[in-house]
Amino acid sequence: LFLHPSLQMPGKYSVPESLLKFFTRITCMGATAKLALSIRDYGDEPVHGIKVVPPLLRQEAKTIIRHHGDYIMGYMLNAGFAEDVKAWHEKHPHTRLHFFWDQPDAPEELKVDDTLTFHRINDEKFLKMMAGCKAFATTAGFESVCEALYMGKPCMLIPAHVEQECNAMDAEREMAGMVSEDFDIDKLKAFARDYEEDVEFRMWENHAECRIVAAIENAYETYYHRKENQAYEEENDSIVAASSLVVPARRVWQG
């Protein structure tokens, strides 16, 4: 999606954004088609070989029973954000918080007190707790934001690098979440009050499998026909070359 002309980049960091696009182009070199995963249908760009498709979410995220519980859930790519969460929690000890972090040396559950718990990353537990939270705060990873959006959870995005900056800006522009520079849960609670579930995204996502399969099949057909035409043209060229050699030979023999 970073190569789609309609995607607006944040514009904060020109060099990292240029490098992100450059790296994306390198990964696409030689591709017959480029599948751009997006929370919205930006429309295909045939000139650039870009086909826009919904995110490919795990089936469990789409079928799990969900409800709005009494706690706020979060995910931190950078464990350093834990201090922000603790600082906010000290001022609001009655708000229940469950945060997942990438801290391998931490216990499975680090219970700070009755209303704040840090959890080591566990996919099954993460999904179950997301399904039951009332709001979700995260460092703007694309997949987790899309899962929360599908479940109808208000999201606060705290980007930690340029790719997440792009994800966060895109999500905020599409009213899928709000962006913050830190884990200020007050902002998330305010956003959640007026939040309405994004039914349009859910409908878009429900067609992910058929759209992606169709795009792959179309790319294969395009590649196959291209190779077939190339082989046909090479065969014709060889016949023409052979004919040009035969004609002079006949003239010599006739002479």
Say what each PLM segment does.
Residues A33-L35, K51, H98, H119, ...:
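Hydrophobic/aromatic beta-strand patches that form the interior of the parallel beta-sheet core
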Residues A190-G255:
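C-terminal amphipathic helix plus adjacent low-complexity
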Residues L56-G132:
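Donor-nucleotide binding loops and adjacent catalytic segments primarily
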Residues D123, K128-N167:
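A donor-sugar binding/catalytic signature common to diverse glycosyltransferases
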Residues L110-K111, P154-E197:
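Nucleotide-sugar donor-binding patch of glycosyltransferase catalytic domains
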Residues L1-V52:
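Active-site-proximal region of nucleotide-activated glycan assembly enzymes
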Residues C28-M29, D41-I50, T63-H67, D105-T115, ...:
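Short loop/helix-cap segments at secondary-structure boundaries that form the rim of catalytic
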Residues E124-K125, K187, R211:
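Short acidic active-site motifs
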